[in-house]
Amino acid sequence: MSQIESPNPEPVFQLKGSMLAITVMELARSNLEALDRQLAAKVAQAPNFFSNTPLILALDKLAPNEGPVDLPGLVRICRQHGLRTLAIRANRIEDIAAAIAVDLPVLPPSGARERVIDPIEAEAPKKLPEKPPEPLIKPTRVITSPVRGGQQIYAQGGDLVVVAPVSPGAELLADGNIHVYGPMRGRALAGIKGDTKARIFCQQLSAELISIAGQYKVSEDLRRDPLWGSPVQVSLSGDVLNIIRL
């Protein structure tokens, strides 16, 4: 006898946004033999760094006259050295076609500046201090005038209090909590250095984005919340943002 589903079944999944750091390998030449040798040398220096490391293969810096890339061979070499390819970044038609053929996602070229990673430095154990340093607590930053679109206000080492409206396009950042005593229509990012106990308080939730310690919700998600437009408190539990009425 088949089981009849209820008209309003419980959701079996959620789509969530998260800010993750992923290693990008930028290929300068399509010489797979040289790549194999150089990767082997890097692995010998820092084996723990190359252990199921997620990877984006960036082919967008290859010269237009550079020969075609053997993408399956490139992915295989990376896998042999502990790098797991998630997607490629490309702008040449032949590279995009090769990625589609092996069912790899294609990302657009990035205009952002990317930091060069030294695997040896990344793997080196950091010496722990004998006694944890006392946290440096800075005075709360208080803003009394309206925060307009395009403005960014950062409370380093402490809380941020805004006793005026925050317009769309404005951005509030704090290492601690954020309090907005007025309409919150911009972006609010609390605990930006990883403080999972940080909170966001606002008199009117109409934000473009709210974030605590890297976990965030955008306006499309927030508008579906029954507390949209109400006075709320936002906290983080695990990787879930909880919104409750003030």
Swiss-Prot record:
The gene is minC. This is Probable septum site-determining protein MinC. It comes from Pseudomonas syringae pv. tomato (strain ATCC BAA-871 / DC3000). The keyword Manganese does not apply. Keywords: Cell cycle, Cell division, Septation. The keyword Cell division applies. Cell division inhibitor that blocks the formation of polar Z ring septums. Rapidly oscillates between the poles of the cell to destabilize FtsZ filaments that have formed before they mature into polar Z rings. Prevents FtsZ polymerization. GO terms for biological process: cell morphogenesis; division septum assembly; regulation of cell division; regulation of cell septum assembly. Belongs to the MinC family. It comes from the Bacteria. Disulfide bonds: none annotated. Interacts with MinD and FtsZ.
